[in-house]
From Swiss-Prot:
Named cofactor requirement(s): pyruvate
EC numbers on record: 4.1.1.65
Protein name from the UniProt record: Phosphatidylserine decarboxylase proenzyme
Cellular compartments annotated: Cell membrane
Quaternary context: Heterodimer of a large membrane-associated beta subunit and a small pyruvoyl-containing alpha subunit.
One GO BP annotation of this record: phosphatidylethanolamine biosynthetic process
Gene Ontology cellular-component annotations: plasma membrane
Gene from which the chain derives: psd
PTM remark: Is synthesized initially as an inactive proenzyme. Formation of the active enzyme involves a self-maturation process in which the active site pyruvoyl group is generated from an internal serine residue via an autocatalytic post-translational modification. Two non-identical subunits are generated from the proenzyme in this reaction, and the pyruvate is formed at the N-terminus of the alpha chain, which is derived from the carboxyl end of the proenzyme.
Amino acid sequence: MFDRLAVLPQYLLPKQAITLLAGRVAGARGGKWTTRLIEWFVKRYKVNMREAANPEVASYATFNDFFTRALQAGARPLARADLICPVDGAISQFGAMAGQQIFQAKGHHYSSTALVGGDAALAAQFDDGHFATLYLSPRDYHRIHMPCDGVLRRMIYVPGALFSVNPTTALGVPGLFARNERVVCVFESARGPFVLVLVGATIVGSMATVWHGVVNPPRSTAVREWRYDEQPVRLKQGEEMGRFLLGSTVVMLFPKGPLQFNPAWSPGAAIRLGEAMARQPPLA
């Protein structure tokens, strides 16, 4: 009951309008005003600028430039692992799926079909598979990288709500990650198909991929899809695949099989890009 009461204001707030305003502010070239905003943000969230490729706050023309900053070369060495962690952040949940059911938080599950925008055939490829939900806080590095080598097959934009995706909201909003706006990226690998879902949230101005650029805005009320069978996009493990312009959550789906997550992982634990995420033998 407390969890639902805690998120009640989010049902009442004009989330779309707030997000639109935040996106305009983040993209504005405000000179000294922008620099002061970034300085406040760095101090408020204890952002480690020493590991940024460009640590000089005043050199960023917009807040978005700062928020999507690159890291210094070598700041995130890649583990020798079948699957590496694709982001900096914290583990929300991970584990095995029961059929199409994905565990969100205590008392809450949602379906893989709902997550991928209603495509039952796509979701069926991951029945009884594995999932990982990773939360990116405001202080984190906000580029998303490949957990393994992969070939892009499809990208699906799914319109939705813009609830916050912090742990409190995950406890209080049923089906949160299948309700929010999201971008579903479908890949093929030597270990079978996998899905990377970029989940939007309140104040997340937009999401972008390296092959498409900014996916939203413009925001749509209908599901949109792009296919890449004739012009496949090939990405190596550790390569950037996308980014959040203001932060959110990544959900990954893997098919049924002998996947073993890192035994050091646990819900709520901090994670870093490049660390070992799981063992997953190649297909025979």
